Amino acid sequence: GLGDIGPLASKPVMEGKGVLFKKFAGVDVFDIEIDEKDPAKLVDIIASLEPTFGAINLEDIKAPDCFYVERELRKRMKIPVFHDDQHGTAITVGAAMINALKVAGKDPKTVKLVTSGAGAAALACLGLLLKLGIPRENIYVTDLAGVVYEGRTELMDEDKQFFAQNTPARTLGEIIEDADVFLGLSAGGVLKKDMVRKMAARPIIFALANPNPEILPEDVKSVRDDAI
């Protein structure tokens, strides 16, 4: 997205989410923007609000801090804690993936999935896609340092290590060959037309980077009329 733009600049986004809660679920919400970067202090602040609210929806906390914040709040609080960037994105991607695989006539157990991005949203999506039947050995993760492979040390953490693969490929351009699915949760323009050409028949492309997608739909269709 736009990166760390501060709590004041995020307020219109939070207010917009509040409108969606009210319109589609009839839930009244309060948007609360907190000017705090220390994860432990953030947990203390949010936990202290429990007597006032019935649930907490976390928004726009960077990885890996978001995993710690959510985990600690769930331990301490007796009300539901939901991280929108992780679980909201994962639910949407999971539903879309089920339908896309049906349309493409592909089996989740045999597809090759390549993801660009290894932040909170991407890792949450992959966690749900595992439960929907895509095997871990068929999932290839890329980030700013390239392919997440066994033995890599740069920009690695425990969550990425789970998806490390034994592969000689080091770049998105290499690993995308014969991929059935591209899941983009990274940055605009990273998926090139030449990469789309190298994907398997009836490729499924989720270009979800915000505000600019990894590739535009018209660019995909210009090189692959069988793409979904």
Model-found features: residue ranges?
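Rossmann-fold NAD(P)-binding glycine/threonine-rich loop
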Residues: 71, 189-228
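A short, aliphatic-rich alpha-helical micro-motif
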Residues: 50, 108, 175-176, 196-199
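General beta-strand structural signal in soluble alpha/beta enzymes
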Residues: 31-32, 57-60, 81-84, 115, ...
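N-terminal ligand-binding/catalytic initiation module
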Residues: 1-81
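Conserved acidic residues
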Residues: 53-54, 180, 203
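Short, acidic/small-residue loops that bind anionic groups at enzyme active sites
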Residues: 76-90, 205-210
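Short, ordered loop/turn segments at secondary-structure junctions
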Residues: 34-35, 60-63, 84-87, 144-145, ...
